[in-house]
Structure formats: C-alpha cells, structure tokens
Amino acid sequence: MSSRADGAVTTVGTVRVIVTGGGTGGHVYPALTTVNALREALAEQGRELEVVWVGARGKLEERVAGQAGIEFLPVATGKLRRAKNPLGMLTWTNIKDLARVPWGALQSVAIVRKRKPDVVVGFGGYVAVPVSVAAWLCRRPLVIHEQTVRLGLANRLLARMAKSTTVSSPSTLDLLPGRARKRAEVVGNPIRAELFGGDPGRAIAALALTGFDRNLPTVYVTGGAQGARQINNLVTDDLPWLLKQANVIHQCGATEITRVRETADQLSPDLKQHYHLAEFIGTELPDVFALADLVIARSGAGTISELAALGKPAILIPLASAAGSEQAFNARYLDENGAAKALLGEVTPADLRAAIATLLDTPAARTQMASNARTLGKPAAAQSLAALILRTAQ
C-alpha cells in the first residue's frame, strides 16, 4: 500500500479511473473498448485498473457496465433537445431536464471526492457533463473523447476544461477552441477487437447460407441494432434486381422483420436462396463483415469507424434527424476521401441502385474504396487512447 499526495491510499500499481458517458452505443461501446484496452495495458505492466462507470440510471451504459463487471454509479442528468429555432428549445421537457443538472453535478462532485481518481475520462453524451465538470472542480485530470467528425455539444462545452481532448478525425481539430486544439490528439474511435477476427466461412456456416452463390459478391445491409425503415424500404423496393447481382445479408431490426419477410416471401426460389433476412446480427458480425464485399448502412460514428478500420467499401445513408446532422457530416467526410459513397437528402430506390451498380460492376472501384477507407481507419485507436490516459494519470 502507498499514500498519494492527495492523501488517498491506493494499492501499488493500481490506476484509478472514472469513466463517464452514455445514452447511445456510439458513446458506450468506445468507452467499454477503452476500459478493456486499459486493463490489458496495465496487466502487461503487472498493474491493475480500478474503474467505476458513472452514468444515467436505466440507460444503456448501466446495462453494458453490469455485463462487463464494471462498478456503476448513477447520477441525475438532463438532455437538451435541440431545434432549428432557439425559441423551440424553450420547452417544459427541456426546462425540467436541465433542472436536474445541478443535482447531478453535486452527486458527481461527491463521487469524485470520494473515489479520488487518477484521471476522469468522458466519452460524450449529456451524462458526461456533470461528471467532467466535477473532475475540473476537484482538480482531477480530465480526458475527453469525441467519436463524431462534427464535435458534439457536450464535448464542445467540456474541451476547455480537459487536460487532453482526443478526437477520431483530423477534421474535428479545427472545430475545437484555440487552447483546446493545442491539447488535442487524433487517436481514432475505439472499436471492438473481435471485429478484426472475422472469417467468411464461419458466417456461411453460422447463418446457414448454403444457397449463396460464391461467384457473386455479398452485400450486407444494416440499419444498426434497431434497424432502419428507410434503408429497409429502399432495399426491398428493388430486391429482385439486387439479388440478381449479389447475395444479400439483411439485418432489418425487430420491428420490421414481419413486414420485410412478407416481401421476401414473394421472391422466386432461385432469388430467395441468395437472401438471408435477420432481425439482428450478433456474435456473427465479425464474420459477416469478413464475408461482405459491400456494406449498406447508416453513418453513425461507430459504424464509420468500423468500416474504415476494416477497409469495407460502403454506401452510407445518414439518419436525417441525427443530432446536429452529425451522420451527414460523417458520411460526407468518408465520401470526400473516397472511402464510401454517401447518399444524402431524399434518397430514392433509383439512387441506391445506381450506387450499388457502380460498385458491384467495378471491382477495381471497390478495391480503391477499401484502400481509401483503411487509410482513414485507425484499428489501434483503443490502444492509443489507453496509452494517453495512462500518461495523463501519472
């Protein structure tokens, strides 16, 4: 045992970290991946990680932390629902939520004072605000991470307080305040290590894709874990044409499975054997990615980071209502760098068909897109971020 300068008694070699952030998978899973990378890095040094996750009760972060065996502490928080007209934000729901923030800040200060972390790491989302402010008030080093190309509102506020701001894309640096920019580092967006171990043969076996024609390319269609009606509609409207060009694995989401299956049931047997419909792709995802020659997806921060790191050619259809149109910014960033094709605005089945045809008919175009994606991808992002956090904690 040893005593730190602040009076906290700690096991020799133990690093104390408070992780905060949540609300969506885009914040939660990079945080979890980073915690795992921290544990691995410290284990190699014969040291240990003492970590607590501070988030909102009943949200995704509480469930994920519990499943990973990470201690979880809830604090009150509120969400600011944005509107094009600033007056539109003066709603009772916004006012009620924002009134919870001071209480959340007091809770967070109490947690930081009691735990005396070596470093606090924020991954965005509104719950990260009170905890990060508490770190600043208690003079604990704060590291924040931005997953999106366009700087999120929470991190825009916190960047001035952070000892280090880490971002996923060089394009984000110019959006930071001047002083924060000098303390910023591009590390990429941490993605799950298991995604890099995919095997096409395992996907065929696990999903029983015995009818797939291996002479055809494979297209993976996904709207994320919940599915996306817009993408489902675009694909099913032209499904017979698509199945003449490719095998298709289609993750449509639980709420859409019945409707999409009705469309699939109308396919001729020779086309239907090239089509695999699922409401969710779980543990098979690394293998599905390995099998896919082309991915059709949304453009959330996690998705584009995975596609880039894996070097997967993609057609991106952003969620128009994403906060601050961040998905459109993400998609445009990859498109401008030749790493994906972005379909923006009102997308029609004809638009999607043209984009698919160009990439399926021209293997060289897919190869070049994959190469461009890998150039943007940072597969060691979790390790880079973990190393920075440990340097900050010293």
Write out the residue ranges for each language-model feature.
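N-terminal subdomain of nucleotide-sugar transferases
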Residues: 2-58
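Conserved nucleotide-sugar phosphate-binding/catalytic loop shared by glycosyltransferases and other
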Residues: 17-22, 43, 47-100, 187-189, ...
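Donor-nucleotide binding loops and adjacent catalytic segments primarily
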Residues: 48, 64, 83, 200-295, ...
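Acidic donor-binding loop of glycosyltransferase active sites
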Residues: 117-119, 289-303
